Amino acid sequence: MKYTTIVFDCDGTLLNTATDLANAVNHVLRTHNFPEKSLAEVKAALGNAVTYLMRQCLPSTVADHELEPYIEEFKAYYGEHLKDTTAPYPGILDMLDELREQGYKLAIVSNKIQEGVTPLNKEYFGDRLPVAIGERPGLQRKPAPDMVLQALKELNSPPEESIYVGDSEVDVATAENSGLLCIGVTWGFREESLHQELGVTHIAQKADDILSIIETLNK
């Protein structure tokens, strides 16, 4: 088997978290009498961790050095509401079960804070994804390779045997920086045209496509 390990992004790839994230953003904005953001506006800012998300959604009158209290408010609210509407995308659980049955090693690597990744992984995926890396001290977040390489270390897998699956430009860059082949998915927070523009050659339009792409790659 040429590829033995599949590493997944979380938000926009495995889980549709957009509404819960948007609700948390808008809770902070409402609290401070700032204009709220649409779901589309929040989705466009997702993928690059919470500091970037809040920078994009807060007014420019809030200086960069003033962001931290708003970030903490977001984290507190989201921590209590991260499972209100979140759910796996169609076919994801069956796809993960099939990969696991075929003997693939599986992991999540996400720019979501570790305090979000851990409970969501446990709630929705059980033991399907034994390694789940979120934003934490000591690891540079995506698109730096650190988080992916940490996951591969825990799985005892080399990059050349591993595939990264994600929905955004951050994921494409992460795969490249980590030395992994990339599969782009079109059901998340970005359009299919983005993957085409970035030169992604393996694009999944539904969860089953991930299985068929991997099967073809391993022939």
Residue ranges of each PLM-predicted region?
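Short acidic-hydrophobic, aromatic-tinged amphipathic segments that line or gate anion-handling sites
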Residues: 202-206
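Nucleotide-sugar donor-binding loop of glycosyltransferases
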Residues: 186
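N-terminal helical cap/lid subdomain that shapes the substrate entry/recognition surface
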Residues: 2-94, 102, 118
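Conserved phosphate-coupling serine/threonine residues in phosphotransfer and NTP-handling enzymes
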Residues: 13, 110-112
